């Protein structure tokens, strides 16, 4: 009798567990294992690749309902690295990123559409160089699951996008430097139910710090 009476309880627990798994889960972007790569034509000779670091970010992902997903990322523009101090200074300087005036780029998704088994399109708004414009990112879900030793649950994504730098007010050297910039994203994020809250706290703290610094001048 005891054996049979345990079946409804077990079934109920299984249903509860299934419902919990179906909900969107929040992840904190791993800034060490995530990168933003950018490339533009250099006078027709080559397309050098540079790297930008992600300062902070979080994402929400539901493998059963991609439409409920969301991504918010801040990119550290002063971190731009093309492997040469001169190039780095030029790219982060006033003629291009102007990182001293605009230290971060901000991307926030507004819609996520599944296009294939592991592929999708991310529509969002990118704020760069003081200009906010819509940007579309094509992405692939590489893997979602526990790490080798099971200490963390990680979600991994790769993405690509293209933008016209002149639309963001970066008009210098249009003949020597291509206006179309190709963006490649490699993202790893750790399961963290506090990811959104922690991001907001860090962003608010940074905003207050910048406001205080501006008031001192």
Language-model region placement:
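Bacterial N-terminal signal peptides that target proteins for export
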Residues: 1-9
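N-terminal signal peptide c-region/cleavage motif recognized by signal peptidases
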Residues: 17-19
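Low-complexity, acidic/polar, glycine-enriched regions of mature
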Residues: 21-217
